[in-house]
Amino acid sequence: MTRTVCLPIAVAALACIPLATIAQPLDTPGVTSPLTAAQIARENPPNALTGAAVDKPVVLKSAGGVSVRVVKLAEGLSHPDGLVFLPDGHTMLITERAGRLRVVKDGMLDPTPVSGLPDMDHVELGGLQNVVLHPDFAKNHFLYLSYSKNRLPQLGTTLAVARARYDQGRLTDVKEILVTEAWESPLGTYGGRMIFGPDGMLYISVGDRDGTTHNDVSSARPQAQSLASHIGKILRVRDDGSIPADNPFVKDAKAKGEIYSYGHRNVYGIAWDPKTGKMWTSEFGPAGGDEINRELPGHNYGWPLVSLGRNYSGHLVSDQPWHRDGMDDPVYFWNPTFNPENMIFYTGDKFPRLKGSLLVAGATKKIAQMVIRDDDFIMMGGTMLQELNVRFRDIAQSPDGYIYVLTEGRLRGPKDTDGMLLRLEPVAASAVASERDNRGALSPATPD
């Protein structure tokens, strides 16, 4: 049985604002926490609902009068991170960090996980990260998994990618096609977002693997600037893991040939604009300094030499937080933090006001709607779903135009099972009014 909630999309009037205006002042160095009480209250409004509120039919109306119905399809998931639709349009695969690949068919979660997954490490943020289908999946049944891998008895973990054939709830012909040179503490984040580009190549993000973010000194962090390491990079490989001959650093004997771009912290979102063919990424900063970047081959995106964020100690990451020659500035950034996860360009017809928009899932418990102009200028269109008070990990569009999101309650905890799969559906104004009449008084929406 599915349960529904009608929630608004809080859509602000679009405005063109210079980057200098968007930036908010950084706090005074040396503070205990980079977030003020006001910022914390903004991210957790006093009338925010809990994730459990999806069990109750509640209508929240936005100032713009645009609402969505939220349908819970699955619950009890343990840190779900990635979801993908099979070609039939009604079957989904979902990754759980605990090392399980789950199947949802016709809106029902199969209690039995997919069998045959590769061995992986599950310490801290390790485990199964992401899943993506081969562009020719309908014929070859290939899918790809990103996950953390150890090398016991030696210390350290890294990100790996395996290819396998999916057949009715089991994996066969499993082959590890890439083991990244990103061996560091299991406390460090892995990245692991994957997507096939229009060129048929597989793009993979590798995190900065920094397990010391509460301190100001890190041995892993500077490797994001080194072409001899996979840390802090976007990689580009063929579907078998081999290196394309046209990769930007393939002729540099000292560089890793898989590298497409570098100078990243943690890229958790990758999307291609179907209108322009441009590649965009969302980058998760430490405390503030989250970014949206226009991704280009061979470019350096600055981390950690340039960042508007702070270490969790409260000190600035960089003594030059904005621009350095030879490094790309972000097209858009957040201060205070938004914690962007995955993102999509919405192309469906179910939500006309969202069509063509970039939708970015946020671990700060909201989803952002952004509009990218032809000149790559980004305009913020507003946020939605902050009333649910859950962390959004992934967002996807179904073949029939609905929007699906994965949520979790908190970042860590291998036994946590508070994750959900939600479907967003359009709601006509008459239906919202009818449900309001049936349910009585409504909780007001919280403006962003």
Spell out what each predicted region is.
Residues 24-210, 269-272, 278-285, 336-375, ...:
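Acidic, Gly/Ser/Thr-rich repeat motifs that build Ca2+-stabilized beta-propeller blades
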Residues 18-20:
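N-terminal signal peptide c-region/cleavage motif recognized by signal peptidases
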Residues 1-9:
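Bacterial N-terminal signal peptides that target proteins for export
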Residues 113-126, 174-190, 230, 239-260, ...:
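Surface-exposed loop and turn segments in beta-propeller and other repeat-based domains
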Residues 264, 377-399:
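Conserved blade-ending motifs and adjacent loop-strand segments that build the rim/top face
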Residues 159-169, 222-240, 295-296, 419-425:
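Beta-propeller blade signature
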Residues 255-291:
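Repeat-solenoid scaffold signature
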Residues 239, 373-374, 415, 422-442:
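Flexible "stalk/tail and boundary" regions
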